[in-house]
Amino acid sequence: DVDAHLEAIAAAHGPFVVHLRGTGTFRPVSPVVFVALARGIADCEQLELATRRGPLAGPLRFPYHPHVTVAQEVDDDALDAVEQELADFDGTFEVTTLDRYVNDEDGMWRPVRSFALTGPAHLTSDGTRP
């Protein structure tokens, strides 16, 4: 059961901080511009690794790369404009939930359920708590 799987993951992982800074792109492989993570990468990778086991195991189309997509499947001029406009973006937020979405028949992603991250906080690379 997917919900039981996600509940167990959320219980094993604590909240963490994500710091977003600057932009990047997956072009020419994929027409995507994203805001890059400067902090929280390891926490995202741990959640991804845990999630892609059991009922959600399966091959990836691309290697996992934590990011926030801000533009995709638009023309190159629009991608260039977004990448330049957000180049100096800098923001921080706390991740407190793992959320399950479904992709409906109309192609829209819709939230179904949130799972609170209630596990212990992981240590950062310098040995401190986030």
Short names for language-model regions:
Residues 1-130:
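Histidine-dependent nucleotide/RNA phosphoesterase domain, centered on the 2H-phosphoesterase fold
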